[in-house]
Amino acid sequence: MEVANKTQQKHFVLVHGAGHGAWCWYKLKLLLESSGHKVTAIDLATSGANPKRLDEVDTLKDYCSPLLELMAAIPQDDKVILVGHSYGGFCIALAMDLYPKKISIGVFVASVMPDSTHPPNYFINQYYKWNPVGEDSTDTKVETFGDPDQPRTVIHFGPIYLSTKLYQNCTSEEIELAKFLLRPLSVFSNDLSKLKAFSEEGYGSVRRGYIMCSEDKAVPAGLQHWLIENVGASEVKEIKGADHMPMISKPQELCQCLVEITEKVV
């Protein structure tokens, strides 16, 4: 892969999925930087090394606050490429809605990708339609806490679920790393149920790309195709042999897809 010069250099902002952190991008970050690009990988609230606890974060916006703070600090004449993985698709969609002029393209990787017609919760329901609760969930645990009238849900990915549904094409060492670093997660369903659709003038004005993973067992191929057909993306790529974690199982291929997408649109 050619090394980008200063005029070709792009700024990639990498946004992890639920339960993960900036750490999961360690291979891709090095590859993009080696190609001459600038990379920022962030820890969302309650994730990675972020000190927030789940009982301190109530909303999607709270969860995304590190990303939104980063976007607010970017100069008005600069543009970044947002890359959102899995649940991180909601996070980059929120940033695209609030800061559309600071974003060249939002790239969704094996991710939920909302539109500007339906509220976010609609896409959570679509996910469960394609991937029913309890189906192949193996040892993943779901707990509730807080107000009994509006309980908060916490999800703990179990080691069997990790190795068979998320990381099945990764090495045993990579799976062990994930077991050490993953944190309990929430999808903030109470908040999502109250949110309106992202706006057409904000989110809808930013180009979207989608990277499919052919062997993803967490976001099924049928759902990925449905999102592309019904929501739409100007650039679509597929990584053959990639599980739900292409940044770990297929980092070279993911890097190539991102570079090719951005070369077309930026």
UniProtKB/Swiss-Prot annotation:
The active site is at 86, 216, 244. Keywords: Alkaloid metabolism, Hydrolase, Serine esterase. GO terms for biological process: alkaloid biosynthetic process; jasmonic acid metabolic process; salicylic acid metabolic process. The keyword Signal does not apply. It comes from the Eukaryota. Pfam families: Abhydrolase_6. Pathway: Alkaloid biosynthesis. Its EC number is 3.1.1.123. Homodimer. PANTHER family: METHYLESTERASE 1 (PTHR10992:SF1083), METHYLESTERASE FAMILY MEMBER (PTHR10992). Hydrolase involved in the biosynthesis of curare monoterpene indole alkaloids (MIAs), natural products such as diaboline, a pharmacologically active compound used to regulate blood pressure. Curare alkaloids act as animal glycine receptor antagonists. Catalyzes the conversion of dehydropreakuammicine to norfluorocurarine. Belongs to the AB hydrolase superfamily. This is Norfluorocurarine synthase 2. It comes from Strychnos sp.
